[in-house]
Regions:
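Long, low-complexity, charged/polar intrinsically disordered regions in eukaryotic proteins
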Residues: 1-32
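Long, charge-rich, low-complexity alpha-helical segments
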Residues: 30-88
Length: 88
């Protein structure tokens, strides 16, 4: 599934993050899926999703260079497919 960077997203209420030295683990208590956020910057993006009007706004606020947005969009799409993040 592709993600619409112009839409607003948030961490699913059934998902919990656990910080790790290089990123974070995210466990979804509803579907029992475990995801790994591989970079601290991706952790920041996921945290900022709830406070921005779009995923693009969260990427910008996290300081992700525009050239890396496609990579981050793919990561966010995978998190959406796993129901870790939801559109709001």
């Amino acid at each position: 599934m592709a993600i619409d960077l112009n839409r607003a997203y948030q961490l699913n209420p059934s998902a919990a993050r656990r910080p790790e030295p290089v990123g974070a683990l995210v466990y979804h208590f509803g579907n029992r899926r475990l995801s790994f956020l591989k970079t601290r910057q991706l952790v920041t993006v996921v945290r900022l999703l709830a406070s921005h009007d779009s995923a693009a706004g969260a990427l910008d606020a996290a300081g992700v260079p525009a050239g890396q947005w496609p990579r981050y969009a793919a990561a966010l799409a995978a998190l959406a497919d796993s129901e870790v993040i939801d559109a709001r």
